Amino acid sequence: MSSSLANRNIYTVSRLNSEVRLLLENEMGIVWLVGEISNFSAPVSGHWYLTLKDSQAQVKCAMFKGNNRLVNFKPQNGQQVLVKARLSLYEPRGDYQIILESMQPEGDGRLQQQFEQLKMQLAAEGLFAQTRKKPLPENPRCVGIITSRTGAALHDILHVLKRRDPNLPVVIYPTLVQGEEAAIQIAQAIGRANTRAECDVLIVGRGGGSLEDLWCFNHEIVARTIAASEIPIISAVGHEIDVTIADFVADVRAPTPSAAAELVSRDHRHKQQALHQWQAKLASTMRHYLAQQETQFARLQHKLDKQHPQARLERQQQQLDELSLRLEQKMQQRLATQQQRWDRLSHKIELHSPIHLIRQQRFNLIQQEQRINQSIQRYLIQSRHQLALLSEKLDAVSPLAALARGYSVTRTTQGELVRQSAQVKPGDTLVTQLMDGEILSTVNSR
């Protein structure tokens, strides 16, 4: 080998596939994918193999039984699904594939997946960090409200402010809080409030609703506008159980619009409100901490999964499944070939078997017997027809026919036919034959 080749890093195919697999698994991490199921297979091993596709591309997928046991529906070919997966490579064939960790029907899952993706992205950028959150003013001079002019949230906020601090100035920045244009309008209203700088604190929110109804508060443009605001912002979206991206980015999260009004107004229960504020901050800090811990745990879990013997066992099990399938196909092909040979030999043996010859001769004999019977039947029919013709002719010349017309035949007792009177003499006995019998008579004279 030349020195130039000796200095090169030359890979074997196995090493190349192994390093590509490690590169995909280590660098890409977790991905979310939506597509249509095809070629779904569930062998006896309990693992699932399928293809995810769209109108232009497809990718092979594997979901091991440890994960697919958590799927609460039976996947079907043609079904649209949302999956959480990690990229990998099936080394024996060099096939790029993805390993599925979770699966759910597309629809509700798509919004939740978008929520989680944006949440992780903004958390990684530090937009949820407690250190960047601005404190609320102790005695605000003016409160800005960013919500729908006709919604129940505005009514609730104004009602609380009027009850607690009727002299507190309020500026309303009306905006849509639902629909495709709502996110842009909310961001514009926040920007307008910062430009005018007439308020010490802003309440951004609306009443409760479904995930789709509240989705404008999960838009990236709203989150980044809240983060960039120089005026402290209280997020007051929906009910206490409703959580949005705006809640994580805002300086303070209030469980309801009414609670937000409580936070910005002061009365004799100031200490109680301050306690609520600290509780809200503590809850926000804990959510942020838990979000960070969850993200860290996911990263550590991913690293552990890659190094765990179970991952190697799953790859080997996948290879075993494929080999089992190939073996089964080969055995079926071999059995089919042997069956064809057996059928041909059986046919040849049957053709030369004495039993076959006997059967053939018996069949020929039956055919001959049938032909003879048919010939006999035809002969009998012809004979009966000829007999009928001869009978008609015989009847035409028979004496009996003359007797039937009223004639008679006379004989002597010796049987001699009497044709003339000279053949008899008085005293002779004659026998006269009629159609229905005989008459004996005696000649008296002639």
Curated annotation (Swiss-Prot):
Alphabetically, which GO biological process terms does the record hold? DNA catabolic process
Task: Note the CDD domains from the entry.
Answer: ExoVII_LU_OBF (cd04489)
One MF annotation (Gene Ontology) recorded for this entry: exodeoxyribonuclease VII activity
EC no.?
A: 3.1.11.6
Q: How does it assemble?
A: Heterooligomer composed of large and small subunits.
Its keywords, alphabetically, are: Cytoplasm, Exonuclease, Hydrolase, Nuclease
User: A Pfam family in this protein?
Assistant: tRNA_anti_2
The record's subcellular location field reads: Cytoplasm
- On the tree of life, the source organism's domain of life is Bacteria
Q: What does this protein do?
A: Bidirectionally degrades single-stranded DNA into large acid-insoluble oligonucleotides, which are then degraded further into small acid-soluble oligonucleotides.
Q: What is this protein called?
A: Exodeoxyribonuclease 7 large subunit
